[in-house]
Amino acid sequence: MTNSAKKPSYFTEAGLPYGREGIRISVLVNETLLDAKSEYGHIQVFDTAFFGKMLVIDGIIQTTVYDEFVYHEMMVILASLRIEKPQSILIIGGGDGGAIKQALRVKSLKRIVMAEIDMTVIDVSREFLPEISDGAFDDPRVELIVQNGAEYVRRHKAEFDLVVLDSTDPVPRSPAEYLFTEEFYHEVKDALEPGGVVALHGGSITFQPAEVTTLVQRLRRVFKYVDLYPAIVPAYQLSLFGFINASDQPQAKTAEVERWMQNIEGQNKYLSSEVYETLGVLPPYIQKELGL
C-alpha cells in the first residue's frame, strides 16, 4: 500500500544581504499564486499556512497580510509623530501599498508622493494582496510616479517633511543598493524641509547586525539625530527588526506623541503611546554587538 499524501511544500528564504550564515527561514506554502519576473526582479506570491498571502522578491520576504501593519506603522506613523502636523511625504518604493495606506491616515498630510521603480510590483500587489493597500492606490490624494526613486529625489529640493525609504533590500548590484549609501542620504536631506525626517528599514538586528550598524553610522554623518527602534515583525526572520529615523531635530517626547496621535485617523494596531515610550530601548547585549 502506497502513501499518496501530498508532501508539504516549503518556501525557504534566500540568504539576507550582509546577513549571518547558518540559518534560513522556511514557510509552509499552501499554494503558489504567482511566480514571474519583471524588468527588475523575480516576484512570487504565496498563500502560506501561517502568514496568509506573502510577497517575495528575489527570494526575500517583503511583506505578508499577517503582520504588514507592524512594519508599515513603524515606517510611516512613527516618522509622522516626530513632527507636529507634517504636510508632505515622499515614499520611495512601497509597491505593496502598505506605506501609502498608513500615510493616508495622517490627517495633516496634504501631499503624498510615491516613487516606485517597478510597476509590476504595484500591479501584482493590487491583484493578489489588495488587503495591504486597502484601496490606497485609487485615492486621489496619492501621486504615484513610476520612476527610480533616487532620480526623483535629486530633482526635488526642500519639498518634503517626511521621506520614507521603503525599498527592497540592498542586494549588491540591485537598483536598491544605492538607496542605502551615504551619498544618497545627503540627497535625501536636500529633499527634506528643515527639520524633516527620513525613515528606513535597517534589517534584522539579530541576523544582519553589521548592516544595521553600518546604516546608523552613515546616517550619523549626515543627520544630527539618528534613532534605532527595534520591533518584532514575525515574517522578517522571527527576529528583532531595526527601524531607523534620522533628522536634525530630536524625537518627540511621549507627552507630545500622545497629543500628536490625534493627527492619526483611526486606531494603530501596533504603535501606541505606551509602545512608543519604550521603543528606543535595546538590551545590553545588542548594544554591545552593534557597537552603537
Protein language model features and the residues they cover:
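Conserved S-adenosyl-L-methionine
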Residues: 223-234
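Short, surface-exposed loop/turn motifs at beta-strand boundaries within globular domains
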Residues: 36-38, 48, 133
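N-terminal glycine-rich anion-binding loops that anchor highly charged ligand groups
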Residues: 43-51
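A general beta-strand register signal
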Residues: 56-57
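The AdoMet/dcAdoMet-binding core of the Class I SAM-like
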Residues: 2-16, 63-197, 206-216, 220, ...
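SAM/dcSAM-binding transferase cores
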Residues: 2-44, 217, 238-292
